[in-house]
Amino acid sequence: MQPDPSGSGGDGNANAKAKLAPPPVTAAGGRPVSVLPHKTANVRDHYRIGKKLGQGQFGTTYLCVDKASGGEFACKSIPKRKLLCREDYEDVWREIQIMHHLSEHPNVVRIRGAYEDALFVHIVMELCAGGELFDRIVAKGHYTERAAAQLIRTIVAVVEGCHSLGVMHRDLKPENFLFASAAEDAPLKATDFGLSMFYKPGDKFSDVVGSPYYVAPEVLQKCYGPESDVWSAGVILYILLCGVPPFWAETEAGIFRQILRGKLDFESEPWPSISDSAKDLVRNMLCRDPTKRLTAHEVLCHPWIVDDAVAPDKPIDSAVLSRLKHFSAMNKLKKMALRVIAESLSEEEIGGLKELFKMIDTDDSGTITFDELKEGLKRVGSELTEHEIQALMEAADIDNSGTIDYGEFIAATLHMNKLEREENLVSAFSFFDKDGSGFITIDELSQACREFGLDDLHLEDMIKDVDQNNDGQIDYSEFTAMMRKGNAGGAGRRTMRNSLQLNLGEILNPSNS
């Protein structure tokens, strides 16, 4: 095995937060200059970097080959220009540490090493070439409660493994589980620990992170612990059994309202034919009171998980597979479009926010106080009350320091107003509409999938889910309707914001709203 160039192997200490070495800082005391605590070899000295496998909000994953052994791995390359503040640097370093910390778990993707150069941080890890969880189920064409029980057993075993080592995943969703290979018996592996945190018993967290459908109610209420991972696994189980999420609405805010107050539906098809034991487990994983929710260990001891005779082996209704296909396809198309928009935002746009930050930060301290925010809002003509300004302040202040730093300010102001601006939607639509016909066809979607390194097995479903007039293609109005519906993907590293932070962006950038 390659020696670990990051020097960040796990030491089994659950309270590992304390050992998180801060990256070096520039002489001026500003943004860090590196993520890793010491210099590493160049990744290309050891690996040949090959084709693109996929692209996320913060990094691109490539196939890479070990020059010494010929073994194939995955290399996630994170551009340092996307790390806007100290907290972003620390997040990447923490992700590397957590991957080392969990590397002995059989269902966690194994890290091989981390490298850094002037422009990128590279994380080399085990290659999982077997595709995403839902894609495998859909490709099979049928599955049973017993098969669903086996999948949830694996997912919750990962959660239990994380919690036993003092790690909270915080972004459990089907897209973050990949099969190691295309083999029928390939193990399922958890990936993407970019939002994960070290914790110790009794710790409570307040930053709102995760992905809308899967986020626990206590996360939205800004006071949560590891129990939130069990809720997310419960959402995955619900989707596996019926093909749609338990809490659904047309907008992100609507999804959150449903999560906080909505009723679980066990009446619609196929629930009447699902076993009582499965429904009991779902209820107890999706209990809104985290103190009464099952722990990961208790889930693994539930009869539906433990006893093969309890989970029926008869095929689940084929309509569930059809829904699952649509749900998965919709996520992929929207994610591609979101990435196109994120990549198209210019330095000038962020530069404008930088100037706005400087204008409000009158003492050049690098942070905005309540008084500075109040004065800044007054200067742009806002008539908010002190109470409303305080609410905005608390919503944008991710680390609860009482001030807003540059990274928090960018995250709070560079969000939905950019996504929903007409020119950004036009630009994203044009990316897919290669021939400029005004329609996105199946061939154009196939080409886009290849450019993003995505499997294009379910292109018909991608189109069908968005195509309101059933003409077999997507026009601009259908595309924008999809983009403005409840957000299908995660908003990434600390950028899933509540409405107060969206309002902060709108108030400070009225011309962009």
Curated annotation (Swiss-Prot):
The keyword Kinase belongs to this UniProt entry's keyword annotation: yes
Chief subcellular location: cytoplasm
Domain Protein kinase: start-end pairs: 47-305
Residues reported to bind Ca(2+) 2: D397, D399, S401, T403, E408
Domain EF-hand positions: 348-383, 384-419, 420-455, 458-489
Active site (catalytic residues): D171 (proton acceptor)
Residues that bind Ca(2+) 1: D361, D363, S365, T367, E372
Reaction(s) the record says it catalyses: L-seryl-[protein] + ATP = O-phospho-L-seryl-[protein] + ADP + H(+); L-threonyl-[protein] + ATP = O-phospho-L-threonyl-[protein] + ADP + H(+)
Record family assignment: Belongs to the protein kinase superfamily. Ser/Thr protein kinase family. CDPK subfamily.
Protein role: May play a role in signal transduction pathways that involve calcium as a second messenger. Possesses calcium-dependent protein kinase activity in vitro.
Record's comment describing the protein's domains: There are 3 contiguous domains conserved in the CDPK subfamily: a kinase domain, an autoinhibitory (junction) domain and a calmodulin-like domain. The autoinhibitory domain (311-341) inactivates kinase activity under calcium-free conditions.
Name of protein: Calcium-dependent protein kinase 24
